[in-house]
Curated annotation (Swiss-Prot):
This is Internalin I. It is found in: Secreted, Cell wall. It is a peptidoglycan-anchor. A motif (LPXTG sorting signal) lies at residues 1740-1744. The keyword Repeat applies. Its main location: secreted. Residues 1507-1566, 1572-1631, 1641-1702 form the MucBP domain. Residues 1-28 form the signal peptide. It comes from the Bacteria. The gene is inlI. Residues 1744-1775 form a propeptide. The lineage of its organism: Bacteria, Bacillati, Bacillota, Bacilli, Bacillales. The modification Pentaglycyl murein peptidoglycan amidated threonine is found at T1743.
Length: 1775
C-alpha cells in the first residue's frame, strides 16, 4: 500500500514539475517547426547531377517519341536515387506527450539552474537551441533550461550556413542531454568531435555532411539504432571504419570525402548486416574488397573515384542490383563480375581509360548498361543478357565494330552516337528495339537497318551517307534524323504512316521526292541543301512546321490542304513568287527573306499569322497584302530599288512592329505623305530609315502609340507631323534635311533623340528633353547661310547657332583664321581665291551632343598674276593678246585680264616700258599687276666656212683661223672662238670650233660651228719571230716574251700583246699570241700572230720506306700513312699526286700483314713507277684487372653489379673490354654473411685476364628512430608539400637506411586555407618491418596578413571608352589581391570617373581579406582624353549589274561599310567615281572624321559594274482568236537593255505593230495580234500599143502570199512574148501584156532550163525559153525550198539554131530556221493595184520564177513609155 501511495505522490510531483512546460504545447499531436533548412550538400549534389543530366541531353531533340521520353524519365529517376541524401529536410520536432518523456535512468542530467549558455559551451549552439525551444526568435541563450525541455525534442535541424560562417557550430558539447533525439542534422558546420552524441542511442538518422574539420567518426560506434548516416563533403575524412559494427544501418552517404582505403571490420559479428545503399562518390578509392563483405548491399555509388582501376573485387557482393562507377577515370577494366547475378544497372559514363566491357555477359537480370564517353574498343560478346533494355555506348571514339549487339530480345534503346562506327553490321534479333541513335559516326550506308518492327526513333545524322535506302520494314517509325550527311536524294521517304518528324537538313539534296502517304508528319526540316522544288508539300493534314531555308528553291508548289501548318521558313532561296501563301488557317510565322520574290499574291485567309519577314527580295509593292487580322510584326527591309509602293495597308490594323528600312519608298513621289500608314494606330515600332526619297511624313501624325520611330537617311525637311506622337520614347531622324525641330519640344516621353547630319543650327526646342535627362544627339550638322557676301579683305556675320538654353553657341573652330567676339564672327585679310569659308561648333553637356559646320559663301576679289618682265626685239609685231600669253597672265577665278600694252609699248624704239594688267568680276576691281617690257636691238648673224684642214704640228693663231674660214657678221661685230682650247695641232683628228658674237645690247648671235681637221701619221709596221718554245712551269713576263721573239716597229710605237692572258705556262700545249701597236695619232697596226709552244711535264720518281707497323685500332688515314712512310716525289714543281690503296687494303681492326702500293700520275698523263710498302697490324695484349680485396654492405641494401664494380674500384687497362662477375648470382644482400665474388675479362682477340677475387660482407639492419622539430608555422596559402614539410622540421631516421622512409598525415591533417594549429603524426618502418615510435609535430597556419596593393600611378582612356572596374584593375596592373590571397579589391572607379567628360580623376583602391586584415589604400590618376581616330572597315569589292539602281547609301550597305564610332558619318566619292551605266572597275574611297577632328585612314573599295543577263522575252504571233499562227521566238539581252521588234510578215495575215520594252529580271511575253487578209484578184489584160484589147481578159485567184505566173497568149496578127509573176496580195492587181503588130517570122532558138541536185536528180520541172536567133538571153536559177544553188545562180548567152540546155545544180540545206517564212522563188514585191505592165516583144521576157517582186513597182507607170520607145526603135534596127 505504501508503495502504491509513493507512486501516486511521485506522479503528482512529476506532473507539477512539468507544468511550466505547458507553454510548449501547440496541440495534442502537433509539431512546432522553427526552421526548415535542407541539407546543403544534398542540394549541391542534386544540382550537380541535374547539370550533368541537362548537359548530356542538350543535343537531344525535343521531338523524341514518347517511348524515348519515358526512358529518359526513368534515367532521371535513377539519377535522383543515386544522389539521395538520407538526412535531408529534418525538421525540429518537440515531443509534447509527457507520458513519453523519460527522466529516469538518464545518462546525463541537466544541472539545476542551467541556462543554454552554461549548458552548451558553443554560443551558436546555445542560441539556436534557445530559439527553437522557447519559440522566441530574439532568445539570447541566457534563458533557463532543464532536462524535460531537452528530452522533448526528437528531431533537430542544426545545419549551418557554409561551414565557415560566424553562426556555424564548432562544439556540440551538451547535445548528450537530448537523449530522445531520433533525427539530428549537423551539416554545414565546423564540428570535429562527436563524443557528445556517442550515447544518443535513439538516433535513427544523422547528418554530419560538410563539416570540414571532421577527421574521423569516433563516437558513432554506439548508435545501435542508426539507419541513415550522411558524412558527405567532409574533405578531411579519410576513415569511416567506426561504422562497421552498426547493426541496423541501411544507408551511408560518404561522397566527396577523402577516403582512399575502405577498412570495414567487425570482429564481434557481421559487417553492416543491413546496409543496402552506399554512396561513395568522389573519393579516392583503389580497392573495393570490403564492400564484398556486405551481405545485403544492393546499390553502390562509386562515381568519380579517379584512382579505381577495376571492379573485380566486387565479385562477392552477390546482392548488388545497381553500380554507378561513372567518371572513374583510371578504370581500365571491369574485371570478373560474373558473380553479380542480381545486377540490374551498371553505369560507366566518363571512364576515359575503359577500353573493353567484355565481362558484361551472363548477367541474367541486367536491364541497363550505360558506358558513354569511355575509350571502349571491344564489346566482347555481350552474351546472355536476356533482360537488357537499355544500352548506352555514346562517345566511344574508338568503337568501330558493333557485331556483338545481337540476340537481345528485350533491348528497347540503343545509343551509339559519337563513336567511330563505319558499318552497322547485322543487328539481328532485336525485335523490341524502339530507339536507335547512330549520329556522329562514319557510316556510309544504313541498308542494314531493316527488320526492326518496333523502331520508332532513328538518328543517323552527322555521318557520310549518300543514300538512305528504302527503310520499308520500319512500319512504326515516328522520328527520323538524317541531317548532316552527303545525301543527294531522299525520294524514298514515302508511305510511313506513323512518321511525325523528318530532318534531312545539311546535305546536298536535290531531289526530295513526292513525300506521299505521310499522314502523321508534323515537322519537316530540309534547310541547307540544294533543293529547287518543294511542290510536294501538300495534303499533309498534321504538318505544323516546315524549314526549307538556304536551298535553291524556285518552285514552292501550292501548299494545298495544310490546315495545321504553323511555321513556314523558306528564307535564303531563289523564290520569285509566293502568291500561294493563302488559305493556311493555322499559319503563325512566315520567313521568306533573302529570295528573289517579285510577286507575293494576296496573302489572305491567314487568320493566325502574326509574323512575316519578306526582307531582301524584289517586291515592288505591299498592295497585295490582304486582310491579316492578327499580324503583329511585318519586316520588308532591304528590297532596295524594287520596293517603291506601300499600297493601302488597310488589312493589317493589329500591326505593332513594321520594318521598311533600305527601300525606295516614294521614289516616284506616288506615296505622297505616307497616308497608307495613317490607320496603323497600334504601331509601337516603325522603321523607315534609308529609303532616301521620303520627304512628307504627315501621314504618321495619327500613330499615337508609337514608341520607337526611325526615319534616318531620307529627304525630310518638315517634322511638324510628329508633334502629336506623345508616346514616343526613341526617335531617330539622322541624315535628313531638317532645320526646325520645334515640333518635338512637347514630347515629354521622348528619352532618346538622334538628329545628326541635318541642317539644325537652333537646338533650343530640345531644352525640355535635356532638362529631364534625355539623350539628344545632334552632331555633324551642315548648314549653308543663304546670303552670299562680297568683300575686299574682310567681313563680319552674327553667330546663328543657338544652344539649348537660347544663348549663342560659340564656335569651336573658325576657318581662314576667323575670330569670334560678342556674338560676331569676323574674317580679315582674306586672300585665298575661295567661294566660301566655314566655322564649326561642338558642345557636349547634360546628355546633349550638338556639333556641325556652318558654311558662309562669299565672292572674293580678283587677283592678277604674270611674269615680272618680257623681252622683245626692235621691229617685232606683238598684239596685246600675244603679250598676255607671253607673260602668262592669269586671274584667280578665270576672269578676263586686260592691259595698257598697246598704248605704252613702242616696239620700234629701243628701251624699257612698264605695262599694267587688271581684271574685274561682279563689279569688284581686282588687284593690278606690273610687267616690265624691254625692246632690244637685233642679234648679229655669223657666216664662215664649215670645214678647214691643217697639217700636223702647224702653227695657227685664232686670228689666222678666222681669216682662213672667212668668218664675218652682218653687223661687223667682233667674233670670238674657242680655237686655242678646242684644237690640238700636235695630234691628228677632227675638232669642232664654236664661233660667237653679240651686239651692243648684249644680244647674242646664233653660234656657228666649224670642223677643223688635223692630218694623222701613218700606221706602224710590226716585225718578230713567228713562234717560240718554253718549258712547262717556266716563268716569263710579257716583256721577256717580246724580247725573246725580237719584236719591233718601224716607227718606234709601243708593242702590246695578250701573252699574259693567252698563254698558260703551267699547262702543255700550243697558244696563239697577238701583237698590236698604235701610234700617237691612234692609228693601229695590222695585228701579228705568234705561236707559243709549251712542252709536256717530265715524269717524277717516287721514294718511300719499305715497311710500317701499326697498333690494332690505330686511327690512320691515307694521308697519315704516306707521311709515316716518308713518301715523296723528286720533281718540283709537278702536277703528279701521290696516291695509294691503303684505305681499301689495310684493315686496322684485323691483325696481319698487308701490301700497299703507292702511285703517282701527272696531268699530262705521265705515270711514275709504283712503290710497294708492307704494313703490319699488331694484336691486342691481354687485359689486366685491378680491384679492392673486400667490401661491406648493410643488410637490405640495393646494389647492382655495376654499383658493386664501382664500389670496389674495379678497373681494366683496356677499353671496350667488360669486367664480369658472379655478384648478382651469388650475393644475397637480404642475408648477412661473407660472399666471394670472382672478376673476369676477355678481350676481343680471345686473350683472358687473370681472375681477381673480392670478399663481400653483408651487415645486419637497425631499428629506426625518428627525430624532428616539435613545432613549425607556415603562412596561410603557402604551397607546402609533405616532402618540404619533412625537410623543414628536419625529420630524419637513425638507422641511416635509404629504404626507411618517414611518412606523415601532413596533407590530410592540415588546411592551408584556414589559420589554426594542426597535429601531424610522423611514422617510419625499416625493411625488417620494425616501426619507429610515432612523433607528433604541431603545425600552425598563421593568419593572412593584409595584402600590399601596387598599381600604376596613372592610366589613360579615350572619351566614352567602355571600361569596367575589372578592366581598370587590369589596365593599372593591380597587384596584391590575386590568388592565393583572399583580399578582394574595391574602388570608387564607377562613382568617381565620368568617362563622357575629358579630365583627370583620382580613384582610390582598397582591399580586405577574409581574416579581416585591411590593406593600405592606394590612389591612381585616371586621365580621360579625346577619342581616337575612327576606324573604317568595308568589303574589298562590291559588284553591281549595269543599270542597277543604286546610290551612295546603297553602296555603303552593300560594301558592309562600318565605323567603330557612333555618330561618325562615312563619306565616299561614289557618285563622282562610279558610272553604273558603264561596265568597268571603279575605285571608291571611304573617309570619315569624328567630332574631335580626327580622320580615319581612308579605305578603298573596288566597284565592279558588269553586264547582267536578263530573263528572256518570248515573242508570240496570234490571230484574232488568240491562236498561234507562227512559231514563237525568243529575245535575249542584258538587264535593263532596251529591245524593239517589228511584226514579221506572215502569209495571209497583216500586222504593222512594233513592240518595245526593257529586259528585266522577270521573264516577259509580248504578243503580236494579226488580222487575216482577204485575197485580191489578179486581172490579166491583152492590149495593143494603143490600149485596145486584142483578147479577152483573164483573172487569177488564190490565197494571199501565193505565187502566180501569167504568160502572154498567142493572138493572131500580134506578137508578144512575155511572162509576168508575183504574189497574190489583199489588194486587186492588174497585169497588161502589150502586143505589137506581127512581123515576118524569124528563125527562133530554144533554151531548156533544168533544175537538178548534186546527183542529177530532177528537183523541178524544166522550163523552155525561146527567142530569135542571135538575140541574147539571160536566165536565173529558181528558188527551191530546202536547197541552195551550187555555183552561179544565173546564165547568159545567145540563141542559136541548135537547141541549148542550161542546168542549175542544187545542194540540200542542212537546217532551215523555224522563225523564217518559206519562200518560193525570190521574194517579190507585188505590183500595186491597177499598175499596167507593158512587155517589149523584142526583149527576152523574164521566166517569172526568179523575178523580184520589186519589178512591178520599178516598171509600173513607166513601162508603157519604155515599151513604146523600143517599139519605135526596133523596126529601124531590123531594117
Amino acid at each position: 500500500m505504501k508503495k502504491k501511495f509513493s507512486i501516486v505522490i511521485i506522479s503528482v510531483l512529476l506532473l507539477g514539475y512539468l507544468a511550466p512546460f505547458d507553454t510548449l504545447l501547440v496541440g495534442a499531436d502537433e509539431t512546432t517547426v522553427t526552421e526548415d533548412t535542407t541539407v546543403k550538400t544534398a542540394e549541391t549534389e542534386t544540382a550537380t547531377e541535374a547539370t550533368e543530366s541537362e548537359s548530356g541531353s542538350d543535343n537531344e531533340k525535343a521531338e523524341e517519341p514518347k517511348e524515348a521520353e519515358a526512358s529518359k524519365e526513368t534515367t532521371e529517376k535513377e539519377e535522383k536515387a543515386k544522389t539521395k541524401e538520407p538526412a535531408s529536410n529534418i525538421k525540429t520536432e518537440i515531443n509534447t506527450d509527457k507520458s513519453q518523456l523519460k527522466q529516469t535512468n538518464l545518462k546525463a542530467v541537466v544541472p539545476a539552474g542551467s541556462t543554454y549558455n552554461s549548458l552548451f559551451p558553443d554560443d551558436n549552439l546555445a542560441k539556436k537551441l534557445a530559439v527553437i525551444i522557447t519559440g522566441n526568435a530574439a532568445a539570447t541563450g541566457n534563458e533557463s533550461v532543464d532536462s524535460a525541455a531537452l528530452l522533448a525534442i526528437s528531431q533537430l535541424d542544426l545545419s549551418g550556413e557554409t561551414g565557415n560562417d560566424p553562426t556555424d557550430i564548432s562544439n556540440i558539447e551538451g547535445l548528450q542531454y537530448l537523449e530522445n533525439l531520433t533525427s539530428l542534422n549537423l551539416s554545414e558546420n565546423n564540428i570535429s568531435d562527436l563524443a557528445p552524441i556517442k550515447d544518443l542511442v535513439n538516433l535513427v538518422s544523422l547528418n554530419l555532411s560538410s563539416n570540414r574539420t571532421l577527421v574521423n567518426l569516433s563516437g558513432v560506434e554506439g548508435l545501435v539504432n542508426l539507419q541513415e548516416l550522411n558524412v558527405s563533403a567532409n574533405k578531411a575524412l579519410e576513415d569511416i571504419s567506426q561504422v562497421a559494427a552498426l547493426p541496423v544501418l541501411k544507408e551511408i552517404s560518404a561522397q566527396g570525402c577523402n577516403i582512399k582505403t575502405l577498412e570495414l571490420d567487425n570482429p564481434a559479428g557481421a559487417i553492416l548486416p543491413e546496409l543496402e545503399t552506399f554512396y561513395l562518390q568522389e573519393n579516392d578509392l583503389t580497392d573495393l574488397t570490403s564492400l564484398a563483405k556486405l551481405p545485403k548491399l544492393k546499390n553502390l555509388y562509386i562515381k568519380g573515384n579517379a584512382s579505381l582501376k577495376s571492379l573485380a573485387t566486387l565479385k562477392g557482393a552477390t546482392k548488388l542490383q545497381l553500380i554507378d562507377a561513372s567518371n572513374c577515370t583510371d578504370l581500365e577494366t571491369l574485371g570478373d563480375i560474373s558473380g553479380l547475378s542480381e545486377l540490374e544497372m551498371i553505369q560507366l559514363s566518363g571512364c576515359s581509360k575503359l577500353k573493353e566491357i567484355t565481362s558484361l555477359k551472363d548477367l541474367p537480370n541486367l536491364v541497363n548498361i550505360t558506358a558513354d564517353s569511355c575509350a571502349i574498343e571491344d564489346l566482347g560478346t555481350l552474351n546472355n543478357l536476356p533482360k537488357l533494355q537499355t544500352l548506352i555506348l555514346s562517345d566511344n571514339k574508338d568503337l568501330t565494330n558493333i557485331n556483338a549487339i545481337t540476340d537481345m530480345p528485350q533491348l528497347k534503346t540503343l545509343a551509339l552516337d559519337g563513336c567511330g562506327i563505319t558499318s552497322i553490321g547485322t543487328l539481328d534479333n532485336l525485335p523490341k528495339l524502339e530507339k536507335l541513335d547512330l549520329k556522329e559516326n562514319q557510316l556510309t550506308s544504313i541498308s542494314e537497318i531493316n527488320d526492326l518492327p518496333r523502331l520508332s526513333y532513328l538518328d543517323v545524322s552527322v555521318n557520310y551517307l549518300t543514300t538512305i535506302g528504302e527503310l520499308k520494314k520500319l512500319p512504326l517509325l515516328e522520328w527520323l534524323n538524317v541531317s548532316s550527311n552527303r545525301l543527294s536524294d531522299v525520294s524514298t521517304l514515302t508511305n510511313f504512316p506513323s512518321l511525325n518528324y523528318i530532318n534531312v537538313s545539311n546535305n546536298v539534296i536535290r531531289t526530295v521526292g513526292k513525300m506521299t502517304e505521310l499522314p502523321s508528319l508534323k515537322e519537316f526540316y530540309a534547310q541547307n541543301n540544294n533543293v529547287s522544288d518543294i511542290s510536294m508539300i501538300h495534303d499533309m493534314p498534321n504538318l505544323r512546321k516546315v524549314d526549307a531555308s538556304n536551298n535553291l528553291i524556285t518552285n514552292i508548289g501550292t501548299f494545298d490542304n495544310l490546315p495545321k501548318l504553323q511555321n513556314l521558313d523558306v528564307h535564303s532561296n531563289r523564290i520569285t513568287n509566293t502568291s500561294v501563301i493563302h488559305d493556311l488557317p493555322s499559319l503563325e510565322t512566315f520567313y521568306a527573306q533573302n529570295n528573289l520574290i517579285t510577286n507575293i499574291g494576296t496573302m489572305d485567309n491567314l487568320p493566325e499569322l502574326t509574323y512575316v519577314d519578306l526582307s531582301f527580295n524584289r517586291i515592288p509593292s505591299l498592295a497585295p497584302i490582304g486582310d491579316l487580322p492578327k499580324l503583329e510584326i511585318l519586316k520588308v527591309t532591304d528590297n532596295y530599288s524594287y520596293l517603291r509602293s506601300l499600297g493601302t495597308m488597310d488589312g493589317v490594323s493589329k500591326l505593332r512592329n513594321l520594318e521598311l528600312q533600305n527601300n525606295y519608298l516614294n521614289y516616284t513621289g506616288t506615296e505622297g505623305n505616307l497616308s497608307a500608314l495613317s490607320d496603323l494606330t497600334n504601331l509601337t515600332e516603325l522603321n523607315l530609315r534609308d529609303n532616301g526619297y521620303i520627304s512628307d511624313i504627315s501621314g504618321l501624325s495619327t500613330l499615337s502609340r508609337l514608341i520607337y520611330l526611325n526615319l534616318d537617311s531620307n529627304k525630310i525637311k518638315d517634322i511638324s507631323a510628329l508633334s502629336n506622337l506623345t508616346t514616343l520614347q526613341e526617335l531617330t531622324l539622322e541624315n535628313n534635311q531638317i532645320e526646325d525641330i520645334s515640333a518635338l519640344s512637347d514630347l515629354d516621353n521622348l528619352n532618346k533623340l538622334a538628329l545628326s547630319k541635318n541642317k539644325i543650327i537652333d537646338i533650343s526646342p530640345a531644352a525640355n528633353m535635356v532638362n529631364r535627362g534625355a539623350s539628344v544627339t545632334a552632331s555633324n550638322q551642315t548648314y549653308t547661310l543663304p546670303t552670299v557676301l562680297s568683300y575686299q579683305s574682310s567681313f563680319t556675320i552674327d553667330n546663328p547657332v543657338v544652344w539649348y538654353d537660347g544663348t549663342p553657341l560659340a564656335p569651336s573652330s573658325i576657318a581662314h583664321s576667323g575670330t569670334y567676339k560678342d556674338g560676331e564672327i569676323t574674317w580679315t585679310n582674306m586672300t585665298a581665291a575661295s567661294s566660301s569659308t566655314e566655322f564649326n561648333f561642338n558642345r557636349l553637356k547634360d546628355g546633349l551632343t550638338f556639333s556641325g559646320t556652318i558654311t558662309q559663301p562669299y565672292k572674293s576679289a580678283v587677283k592678277v598674276t604674270a611674269n615680272a618682265e618680257q623681252t622683245y626685239t626692235i621691229g617685232d609685231t606683238i598684239s596685246e593678246e600675244q603679250f598676255l600669253k607671253d607673260v602668262n597672265a592669269k586671274s584667280s577665278d578665270g576672269a578676263p585680264v586686260t592691259s595698257d600694252f598697246a598704248t605704252v609699248v613702242d616696239l620700234n624704239t629701243f628701251g624699257e616700258y612698264e605695262v599694267t594688267l587688271t581684271s574685274e568680276k561682279d563689279g569688284i576691281q581686282g588687284d593690278s599687276c606690273k610687267v616690265i617690257v624691254k625692246v632690244l636691238h637685233g642679234a648679229p648673224v655669223i657666216s664662215a666656212d664649215q670645214t678647214i684642214n691643217y697639217d700636223k704640228h702647224a702653227t695657227i693663231t685664232e686670228k689666222q683661223f678666222l681669216e682662213d674660214v672667212h668668218a664675218s657678221t652682218d653687223l661687223n661685230t667682233a667674233i670670238t672662238t674657242n680655237f686655242s682650247t678646242a684644237v690640238n695641232l700636235n695630234k691628228g683628228g677632227d675638232y669642232t670650233v664654236a664661233l660667237n658674237s653679240e651686239n651692243e645690247d648684249g644680244v647674242k648671235a646664233e653660234t656657228v660651228y666649224v670642223t677643223v681637221t688635223v692630218d694623222k701619221d701613218p700606221a706602224p709596221i710590226i716585225s718578230a719571230k713567228t713562234d717560240i718554245t718554253y718549258d712547262k712551269f717556266s716563268k716569263k713576263t710579257e716583256a721577256a716574251f717580246l724580247d725573246d721573239i725580237d719584236a719591233d716597229t718601224n716607227d718606234g710605237s709601243i708593242i702590246t700583246s695578250n701573252f699574259a692572258t693567252a698563254v698558260n705556262l703551267d699547262k702543255a700545249g700550243d697558244y696563239t699570241v697577238t701583237l698590236n701597236s698604235i701610234n700617237s695619232d691612234g692609228v693601229a697596226s695590222t695585228p701579228t700572230a705568234i705561236i707559243v709552244h709549251v712542252e709536256k711535264e717530265k715524269i717524277a720518281t717516287i721514294s718511300a720506306n719499305t715497311a710500317q707497323q701499326y697498333e690494332k685500332y690505330a686511327e690512320i688515314n691515307e694521308t697519315q700513312f704516306l707521311k709515316d712512310v716518308h713518301a715523296s716525289i723528286n720533281a718540283s714543281p709537278t702536277t703528279a699526286v701521290l696516291e695509294s690503296d691503303f684505305e681499301t687494303v689495310v684493315k686496322l681492326d684485323v691483325p696481319g700483314t698487308y701490301t700497299v702500293t703507292i702511285t703517282a700520275t701527272n696531268e699530262d698523263g705521265g705515270v711514275s713507277a709504283p712503290k710497294e710498302v708492307s704494313v703490319i697490324v699488331k694484336k691486342l695484349p691481354a687485359p689486366e684487372i685491378t680491384a679492392d680485396k673486400e667490401i661491406t654492405y648493410p643488410k637490405f641494401d640495393e646494389v647492382s653489379e655495376a654499383e658493386f664494380l664501382s664500389d670496389i674500384h674495379a678497373t681494366i687497362n683496356e677499353k671496350n673490354v667488360t669486367i664480369t662477375s658472379n655478384f648478382s648470382a651469388d650475393v644475397n644482400l637480404n642475408k648477412a654473411g661473407d660472399y666471394t665474388v670472382t672478376l673476369n675479362a676477355t678481350n676481343e682477340d680471345g686473350v683472358k685476364a687473370t681472375p681477381v677475387e673480392v670478399i663481400v660482407h653483408v651487415q645486419q639492419g637497425e631499428r629506426p628512430v625518428i627525430t624532428a622539430d616539435a613545432t613549425i608555422s607556415y603562412d596561410k596559402f603557402a604551397n607546402i608539400t609533405e616532402a618540404k614539410f619533412l625537410e623543414d622540421i628536419h625529420a630524419t631516421s637513425s638507422d641511416g637506411q635509404s629504404s626507411t622512409v618517414i611518412t606523415s598525415n601532413f596533407e590530410t591533417a592540415t588546411n592551408f586555407k584556414t589559420a589554426m594549429s594542426y597535429t601531424v603524426t610522423l611514422n617510419a618502418v625499416n625493411e625488417d618491418g620494425i616501426s619507429a615510435e610515432p612523433v607528433a609535430v604541431t603545425v600552425t597556419i598563421n593568419k593572412e596578413p593584409a595584402a600590399t596593393l601596387k598599381a600604376d600611378a596613372e592610366v589613360s582612356y579615350a572619351k566614352n571608352e567602355a571600361v569596367t572596374e575589372s578592366d581598370f584593375f587590369k589596365d593599372v596592373h593591380l597587384e596584391g589581391a590575386e590568388a592565393p590571397s583572399t583580399a578582394k579589391a574595391t574602388s570608387n572607379f564607377d562613382s568617381v570617373v565620368d568617362r563622357s567628360k575629358t579630365g583627370d580623376y583620382t580613384v582610390t583602391i582598397n582591399a580586405t581579406n577574409e581574416d579581416g586584415a585591411v590593406s593600405t589604400p592606394i590612389e591612381v590618376i585616371v586621365h580621360i582624353g579625346a577619342e581616337s581616330a575612327p576606324v573604317i572597315t568595308a568589303n574589298a569589292e562590291v559588284k553591281y549589274n549595269k543599270h542597277e539602281q543604286t546610290d551612295e547609301r546603297r553602296f555603303l550597305y552593300d560594301s558592309d561599310a562600318k565605323i567603330d564610332e557612333a555618330n561618325v558619318e562615312i563619306k565616299t566619292d561614289f557618285a563622282e567615281k562610279v558610272d553604273i551605266n558603264k561596265v568597268g572597275t571603279y575605285t571608291v574611297t571611304l573617309t570619315a572624321t569624328n567630332e574631335d577632328g580626327q580622320a580615319a585612314n581612308p579605305v578603298e573599295v573596288s566597284v565592279i559594274v558588269s553586264d547582267a543577263a536578263a530573263e528572256k522575252v518570248n515573242v508570240k504571233y496570234v490571230d484574232e482568236n488568240g491562236a498561234e499562227i507562227s512559231a514563237a521566238e525568243t529575245l535575249t539581252g542584258n538587264l535593263d537593255d532596251a529591245f524593239s521588234i517589228d511584226a514579221k510578215s506572215i502569209a495571209g495575215y497583216k500586222c504593222d505593230a512594233t513592240l518595245s520594252g526593257v529586259f528585266s529580271t522577270v521573264e516577259q511575253t509580248v504578243v503580236f495580234h494579226y488580222k487575216a487578209i482577204e485575197p485580191g484578184v489578179v486581172t490579166i489584160k491583152y492590149e495593143d500599143a494603143n490600149g485596145k484589147a486584142v483578147a479577152e481578159d483573164k483573172q487569177i485567184t488564190g490565197e494571199v502570199g501565193d505565187d502566180f505566173e501569167a504568160e502572154a497568149q498567142t493572138v493572131s496578127g500580134y506578137s508578144c512574148r512575155a511572162i509576168a509573176s508575183g504574189k497574190i496580195t489583199e489588194e486587186p492587181q492588174t497585169i497588161t501584156f502589150t502586143y505589137t503588130t506581127a512581123t515576118p517570122s524569124k528563125k527562133s532558138g530554144e533554151i531548156t532550163v533544168q533544175y537538178v541536185d548534186e546527183s542529177g536528180k530532177k528537183l523541178a520541172d524544166s522550163k523552155k525559153v525561146t527567142g530569135d536567133i542571135d538575140d541574147s538571153y539571160s536566165v536565173e536559177a529558181k528558188a527551191i525550198d530546202g536547197y541552195s544553188v551550187v555555183g552561179d545562180d544565173s546564165a547568159k548567152g545567145v540563141f542559136t539554131e541548135k537547141s541549148q540546155t542550161v542546168t542549175f545544180k542544187y545542194k540540200k540545206n542542212t537546217q532551215v530556221s523555224k522563225d523564217e517564212p518559206k519562200v518560193k522563188g525570190k521574194t517579190n514585191q507585188p505590183p500595186s493595184a491597177d499598175t499596167k505592165l507593158k512587155v517589149d516583144n523584142n526583149t527576152l521576157p523574164a521566166t517569172g520564177d526568179t523575178e523580184n517582186m520589186a519589178l512591178a513597182v520599178l516598171i509600173g507607170f513607166n513601162m508603157l513609155l519604155v515599151a513604146s520607145i523600143f517599139l519605135f526603135r526596133k523596126p529601124k534596127t531590123n531594117q
